[in-house]
């Protein structure tokens, strides 16, 4: 289901981006131009979240194939981080839908918590490795998952910012 959904997200990303490019070529009020600029970022962030979901599915398949099981503590840590990333995404999508600041403080708090949690989990992962409580393969999968969850939190936070403070489309970046 994850792979099918990611393929659909990629398809929709392409279609929506094409539409936004066409809309951006029209003579529009500045506010609409800025909104379109913000939407480009939202579409990209959603696509990147889909990529991370696919990476998580790949990691889960690899864990099964290699017979790797995380410790209960590692599972709890990943669960906590996952819940925070999902909350940010839910809040950001609600803000996107309603175009309000309702959850911004909570998003920023959760984003800070995720950033701190990533540092803490990566450090505890290194300690488990050095004490032989974790195999290098399991450690690699754990570390990649932690990093991916932190990036999901970043992309979800970007969605809230992009819709509330759209990019200034008056900047010409023709040489990029």
Model-found features: residue ranges?
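Cytosolic, long alpha-helical scaffolding segments
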Residues: 1-176
């Amino acid at each position: 289901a994850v792979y099918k959904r990611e393929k659909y997200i990629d398809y929709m990303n392409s279609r929506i981006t094409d539409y936004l490019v066409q809309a951006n070529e029209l003579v529009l009020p500045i506010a609409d131009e800025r909104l379109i600029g913000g939407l480009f970022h939202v579409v990209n962030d959603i696509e990147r979240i889909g990529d991370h979901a696919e990476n998580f599915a790949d990691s889960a398949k690899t864990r099964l194939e290699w017979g790797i099981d995380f410790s209960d503590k590692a599972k709890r840590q990943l669960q906590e981080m996952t819940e925070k990333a999902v909350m940010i995404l839910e809040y950001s999508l609600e803000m996107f839908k309603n175009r309000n600041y309702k959850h911004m403080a909570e998003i920023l708090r959760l984003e800070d918590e995720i950033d701190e949690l990533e540092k803490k989990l990566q450090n505890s992962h290194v300690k488990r490795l050095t004490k032989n409580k974790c195999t290098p393969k399991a450690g690699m999968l754990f570390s990649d998952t932690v990093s991916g969850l932190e990036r999901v939190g970043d992309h979800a936070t970007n969605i809230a910012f992009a819709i509330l403070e759209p990019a200034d489309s008056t900047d010409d970046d023709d040489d990029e």
